């Protein structure tokens, strides 16, 4: 599972990435700062389920802060897009191609309207960020259309001549974009296309199909950055009305980055996504740091309740992708052979079953599956039992 961060230059995309991963991404105020894609590890925030049993988890990967557990996932920051990227302008083809593997996109925009369409600094409030939403939709749709259009007539004729199923054939052709057969079936039905005569499909049909498959394979959440600047609140409400099908969440990437760096330096105690922090030793702070932390506490946390960065990460994976955090554990003992409590956590796709979970843990457990036991209720369930968020299961398997 891969999350991609997209957006034009200078909207705070690299700052968001660094805040989410605390990796060393180069951050500067000009286009093409991140020529090569930056990959990093970000974290999802969930309750530490071991607390329900009076214990604390010992994650093999990720970490625990007080009552929360942070689960790692892969995040990629692709260099800033510019209009015409699908035609290769800027380094568009490379950027879009890097996003091919992404399962969900976080589109960072400048809510303050102080970055123009080229990613250049502009007067506060002078640019409408709605244009950025439309622009990225257009670039991605044209990218998908370009892939779909490539040799379309020959492809369509071959499907007919060889009596192939167009849904299977299209899914195979577009598998690099994570298009599945079911997605193609749904899209063709929704657009009422004649699946028996794909060679009669018109350009407009292909455009609609490309756009629909893009929405299905690259769901997108909009991160409205610089939410603390004057025009941002008004812009955010306007965007929600203009694009009711998108999830918009305001954020301050700079605020989150400052808090995480201060926490890493042991200047403050801060749990990502919370509405407060504690200064550990005020004597260690210089005047500039005191002012910055005071501003974040008042103008960001006090006003909005959080910086928004953690909320966006969680929403991208748990709401848009509908993935679930599921834990393997013993019905009578949460510790592994080394004494670690609930060391593992797996992110499972929607509609996963107990059998899917067994295979995720180990192939042998899946192949020899007998039953799963819900650690909370001690109830045994079969292989088709649907998983839900924060489940804890023991897998019972034969030899």
Where are these regions (language model features)?
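Short, charged beta-turn/beta-strand-edge "cap" motif at the junction between a beta-strand
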Residues: 397-399
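Short, contiguous acidic and Ser/Thr-rich linear segments
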Residues: 338-353
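Canonical P-loop GTPase G-domain recognition
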Residues: 147, 157, 220-221, 227-330
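Conserved G1/Walker A P-loop phosphate-binding module
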Residues: 1-161, 170-174, 215, 219
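Loop/turn positions that initiate beta-strands
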Residues: 390-391
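Short acidic beta-strand-loop surface patches of small beta-rich interaction domains
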Residues: 370-386
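Short amphipathic, charge-patterned alpha-helical segments
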Residues: 351-364
């Amino acid at each position: 599972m891969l999350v991609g961060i997209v957006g034009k230059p200078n909207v705070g995309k690299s700052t968001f990435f660094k805040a989410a991963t605390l990796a060393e991404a180069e951050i500067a105020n000009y286009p093409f700062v991140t020529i090569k894609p930056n990959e990093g590890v970000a974290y999802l925030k969930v309750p530490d389920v071991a607390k329900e049993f009076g214990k604390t988890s010992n994650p093999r990967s990720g970490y625990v802060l007080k009552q929360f557990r942070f689960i790692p996932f892969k995040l990629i920051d692709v260099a800033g897009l510019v209009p015409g990227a699908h035609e290769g302008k800027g380094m568009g083809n490379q950027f879009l191609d890097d996003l091919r593997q992404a399962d969900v996109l976080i589109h960072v925009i400048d809510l303050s309207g102080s970055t123009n369409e080229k990613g250049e600094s502009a007067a506060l409030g002078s640019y409408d960020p709605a244009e950025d939403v439309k622009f990225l939709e257009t670039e991605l749709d044209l990218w998908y259309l370009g892939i779909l259009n490539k040799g379309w007539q020959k492809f369509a004729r071959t499907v007919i001549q060889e009596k192939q199923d167009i849904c299977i054939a299209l899914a195979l052709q577009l598998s690099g974009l994570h298009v599945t057969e079911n997605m193609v079936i749904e899209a063709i039905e929704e657009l009422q296309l004649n699946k028996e005569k794909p060679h009669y499909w018109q350009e407009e049909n292909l455009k609609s199909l490309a756009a629909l498959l893009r929405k299905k394979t690259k769901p997108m959440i909009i991160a409205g950055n610089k939410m603390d600047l004057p025009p941002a609140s008004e812009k955010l409400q306007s965007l929600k009305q203009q694009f009711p099908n998108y999830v918009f969440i305001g954020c301050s990437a700079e605020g989150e980055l400052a808090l995480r760096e201060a926490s890493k330096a042991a200047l403050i105690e801060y749990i990502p996504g919370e509405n407060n922090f504690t200064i550990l030793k005020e004597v260690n702070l210089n005047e500039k740091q005191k002012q910055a932390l005071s501003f974040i506490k008042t103008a960001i946390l006090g006003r909005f309740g959080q910086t928004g960065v953690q909320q966006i990460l969680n929403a991208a994976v748990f709401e848009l992708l509908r993935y679930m955090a599921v834990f393997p554990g013993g019905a009578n003992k949460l510790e592994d052979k080394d004494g670690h409590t609930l060391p593992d956590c797996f992110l499972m796709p929607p509609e996963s079953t107990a059998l899917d979970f067994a295979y995720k843990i180990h192939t042998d457990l899946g192949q020899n599956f007998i039953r799963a036991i819900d650690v909370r209720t001690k109830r045994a369930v079969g292989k088709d039992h649907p998983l839900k968020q924060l489940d804890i299961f023991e897998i019972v398997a034969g030899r």
